[in-house]
């Protein structure tokens, strides 16, 4: 994990060294002050005249002021450089994680929940950022203070300083306990944070459903349960601190009492001066306080390791859909699609049932292919294989005779327009959302695409027309309006293959008929796949695939299937009854 994350410090080690140097300067200056104060006591006691006392006090005071200013300078340098290093470290790490996640396939995203990925990119990276800052400041300051204080203590009384060695076994035990119990606790705590984020995310996204079903109290209970779990896990982690702190404080107080007792005996014997006892005690307290800081710091490092492991897990995830070594770049794509004995299941590592079984058909360039079938029969799974959102587990999906797995991914998806089952719009203006399909589209092209998708009229009715902001992904639009904007976004690409996954379900039949008419008029060379619940949506298709339980049960035109396919006839009859009733 450390090796993986250390690359994000590349080019920052110089600043890190400056930060460490500044902290060491601050530590030395801070610990030199008691010695200067002790020199004042000594000079006052041995001074021959009031004038010499005044001179000694002024000179020592100026020396202490100079040390304080030098220490302040070192501290400011450390604060600035450590903040700079930690911010740049987090910026690089977060950027790398985002780029990695943006290349995830649907299967990769399925491995992590959306809430977990959000937590890892925000909370976990921020924790690592704080750990880096802590390492540059506290992790340097604490050992520096402890070592310098020990040197000063030894210079005053080596024999009394030796007693500090008995603290080492106790410190080792404390550190071992922290490493053994702290890391698992923080691992669990980060998972609890994932859960809290998941509940909040689901609640905010589904707020309309929550209010429509009057389930606010239920969602509050869910949040409180998740929050209570996090608080309970946090309390366990805090319990470790509560256990460690009293032990360290008891050790500190016992040693300080012993120092004053032993120092009094040494002063009585003439070995130490009275002023040296207080100075020696201050150094011992510094050493012990820094040992306590080390124990607290290890708790943060344990949490940092838990977060680091979670971040590295994302960075090390093998992306299962990538470009081949020598990707195929089509020069003049036609849009012909062929499925050859294709089978597919989502869980390729398990033994689950296939979602699709032995699918074979051919769609010629420019044909309109309708796909009908019951809920859960695999319609969406089938079309998801064309742009390689998933890969087939068996067989081949070919475009213009070339396996899609041989295509350059960008080139493949550039020639395909997709309107997914779930309408997704982004924050921004209507114009910006349409340009998602073609980033250099002109205003005229945007208007033409919206006219073809029957969206132009309602867009003009918006307060600012095409410059109207879509709040929270289009919550200020109806379902049918969002569908038409998504269709326009796909149409503006003028793709060779257009996939409409139940994309007119919220559109009235008259508007849907106009959209279909625009396909026939403007997309004669585009191969169109239409998944629909209404037979009327695919009735004029060149081919209709009838899916049932992951298998093709019929292929043909509307008339052919109506004549010899029982499943299709049942669908038509059922819908006809619904209309007549």
Language-model features: locations:
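A short amphipathic helical element positioned immediately N-terminal to and/or at the very start
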Residues: 1-12, 117
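Hydrophobic alpha-helical transmembrane segments of ABC transporter permease domains
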Residues: 10, 21, 25, 29-33, ...
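An intracellular "coupling" helix at the cytosolic face of ABC transporter transmembrane type-1 domains
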Residues: 11, 103-107, 123-136, 140, ...
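Transmembrane helix-loop-helix hairpins at lipid-water interfaces of multipass membrane proteins
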Residues: 13-77, 81, 154-159, 261, ...
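Juxtamembrane helix-loop junctions of ABC transporter transmembrane domains
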Residues: 21-22, 29-42, 67-114, 118, ...
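Helix-loop-helix
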Residues: 47, 152-166, 175, 180, ...
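ABC-type nucleotide-binding domain
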Residues: 53, 330-581
